[in-house]
Amino acid sequence: RKYNLSPKKLSACVEHYNKMELSFVVHLGDFIDRDFASFDKVVPIYNQLKAPHYHVLGNHDFEVADDKKALVPAKLGLKHRYYDFARKGWRFIAIDGNDVSLYAWPKNDPRTKAAAEYHKSLKPRPPSWNGALGDEQLKWIEDKLQAATKAKERVMLFCHFPVYPKNSHNLWNAGALTELLSRYPCVAAYVNGHN
């Protein structure tokens, strides 16, 4: 891993993208690795994009001190950890696969304890660095899919964690999400990072 090369690579990427006519750009997570101060190096570069640009939260984005975890979304310019936006007959849904996780909340946070109990219940037990969507977020996604269906919009989802094919890097509750998505013909694509 050569993370010290990231600012230079990101600058080259932004320069390349700025030569294109893009509708938008989505970064699929892991914007940093283990150092909250790294956001100050890469966020200003990313913000030089001419096209509208968005973030999805990755597991490495939360590998920071407990007192910094709550600051991560705002540092990336996010008002909400999951959100949606529309463009030309499409509904784009950015979801938070770190909603239920062992690392995205402080160690003494009740959400971390609940995530530990959930993780312990999974068989076979997936890696601790993955995460899941909470019930509230799953309901929110379904509401968005229903609204997209009614508006005759196609839907593309963005998440850090994959859901398919079945493997150890997937969202802990990939099955619940794929079952939900399969009920809505408006869903055209699911795009992930992580791997």
Q: Where are each of the predicted segments found?
A:
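Short, well-ordered secondary-structure micro-motifs
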Residues: L22, D66-D67, W105, N167-N170
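Active-site neighborhood of phospho(di)ester-bond hydrolases with catalytic His/Asp-centered motifs
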Residues: V25-D30, H53-N59, I95, M156-C159, ...
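Long, structured stretches of catalytic cores involved in phosphate-ester chemistry, encompassing
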Residues: E153, V163-N195
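Second-shell loop/turn segments in exported
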Residues: G29-I32, P126-G131, P165-K166
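Short acidic, glycine-rich surface-loop motifs adjacent to enzyme active sites
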Residues: L145-P165
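N-terminal active-site segment of His-dependent metallophosphoesterases
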Residues: R1-D40, E136
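Extended active-site neighborhood of metal-dependent phosphoesterases/phosphodiesterases
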Residues: A37-A151, A176-C186
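Alpha-helix N-cap and loop-to-helix initiation/capping positions
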Residues: K2-L5, W129-L133, W172
